[in-house]
Amino acid sequence: MGVSMALEVLVYLAVLVWTCAWDIDVDVSCSQDWMTVSVSAFSQNKRNPYIFADELYLGQNCRVTQIHAHQYDFIYPVSHCGIRTKVISNEIVCFETEMYFRPRNYCLELQIVPLQCSASRKSVWLMPLSTEEDPKPVKSPFMTDFEATPEELGLLNAHQAASSQNKR
């Protein structure tokens, strides 16, 4: 009888822990300057399937920045929220932080979701698109030194004024 009672308690604890487990969908993306974390507002927990924005925090108490119908976004510079930076190589930098999830009413145990993202240190905006050896475009002989005279500008304005009066 003692063994079956102990087995029942273990099964009960396993079920209790399993029902408190949350399966949260998280998508992390980053650049050299920004980290974006998108969290689905729906979980796989059958008893409490909806996650509220005030239950989520990024790093050092940073709140959700955008609320959509089906997801929440954290968009922060990598220098905020305690986001840690690791230089992997001359070309790659890695950012690490945590997302904290504290459910409102159910299983009041705090859950910590580790997050990691890597980005290239070589910005496409800083790379040259052409070099000195690239051919230069030939200057067009058309309209290169065109300057409208005041008379020509007056004629253009008179034509526009006349056409706008015809539309009335």
UniProtKB/Swiss-Prot annotation:
GO cellular component: cytoplasm; extracellular region; germinal vesicle
UniProt keyword list: Cytoplasm, Secreted, Signal
Result of knocking out the encoding gene: Deficient mice are viable, with no overt abnormalities. Female mice are fertile. Triple-gene deletion of OOSP1-3 in mice retains fertility but causes significantly lower blastocyst and reduced offspring number.
Tissue and organ expression note: Expressed in ovaries. Highly expressed in the germinal vesicles oocytes and metaphase II oocytes.
Residues spanning the signal sequence: 1-21
Primary localisation category: secreted
Annotated compartments: Secreted; Cytoplasm
InterPro entries (UniProt xref): PLAC1_fam, ZP-N
Tagged with keyword Signal: yes
Family that this chain belongs to: Belongs to the PLAC1 family.
Protein name: Oocyte-secreted protein 2
